[in-house]
C-alpha cells in the first residue's frame, strides 16, 4: 500500500466484527474493539485519537464501519473510506448474510474489498477530496432546505390561525 495511512479496517454488527483487514501488526485491532464496545448505537460518526492514530467509526443501521489511520492522514480520507465501504457492504449484504454472520466469517469474502478500498483511497486523494467537498455541499443544501421547510410549516400554521381568527370575527359581526 506504499505509505502507511490507512492501517486497519473492519465492519461489525453491534459488537461482533464480521470482516476485517490489515497489512500491519500492532495493538490497533484490540484498541478498535474496545472503542467499538463503548460506541453509542445511534447512527453517527465518531473519531478517537490514540498513539498517533485516529480510530474512525461510522455507525449506520446497526452496523459499524471502522478504519484506523495515522494522525497525519487528512480528516477527509478516513471519512470517505468509511462511506465507500458502508455503501459497498450495504449493497453486497443488505438483508442477507450480514444479519446472521458469525464473528469474522465475512473476512475472507469482504476483507479483499476492504483492502481494495483502502488502497484506492490512499492512491486517489484528489478524488477523495472532491468527493468530500461535494458531500459537504450536499449536507449544507440539505440543512438549508430543512430550515426552509420548517419556515414554510410555521407560516402555514400562522395562516391557519389568521383564517380561524377571521372566521371568529365574521361570526361575531
Provide a role label for each language-model segment.
Residues 1-154, 160-164, 171:
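Soluble N-terminal interaction domains of secretory/endomembrane membrane proteins
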Amino acid at each position: 500500500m506504499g505509505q502507511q495511512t490507512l492501517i486497519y479496517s473492519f465492519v461489525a454488527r453491534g459488537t461482533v466484527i464480521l470482516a476485517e483487514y490489515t497489512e500491519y501488526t500492532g495493538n490497533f485491532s484490540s484498541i478498535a474493539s474496545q472503542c467499538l464496545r463503548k460506541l453509542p448505537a445511534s447512527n453517527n460518526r465518531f473519531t478517537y485519537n490514540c498513539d498517533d492514530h485516529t480510530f474512525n467509526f461510522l455507525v449506520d443501521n446497526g452496523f459499524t464501519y471502522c478504519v484506523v489511520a495515522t494522525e497525519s492522514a487528512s480528516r477527509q480520507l478516513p471519512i470517505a473510506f468509511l462511506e465507500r465501504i458502508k455503501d459497498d457492504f450495504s449493497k453486497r449484504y443488505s438483508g442477507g448474510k450480514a444479519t446472521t454472520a458469525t464473528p469474522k466469517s465475512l473476512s475472507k469474502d469482504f476483507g479483499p474489498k476492504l483492502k481494495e478500498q483502502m488502497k484506492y483511497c490512499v492512491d486517489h486523494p484528489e478524488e477523495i477530496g472532491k468527493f468530500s467537498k461535494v458531500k459537504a455541499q450536499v449536507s449544507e443544501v440539505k440543512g438549508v432546505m430543512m430550515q426552509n421547510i420548517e419556515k414554510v410549516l410555521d407560516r402555514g400554521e400562522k395562516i391557519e390561525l389568521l383564517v380561524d381568527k377571521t372566521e371568529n370575527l365574521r361570526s361575531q359581526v
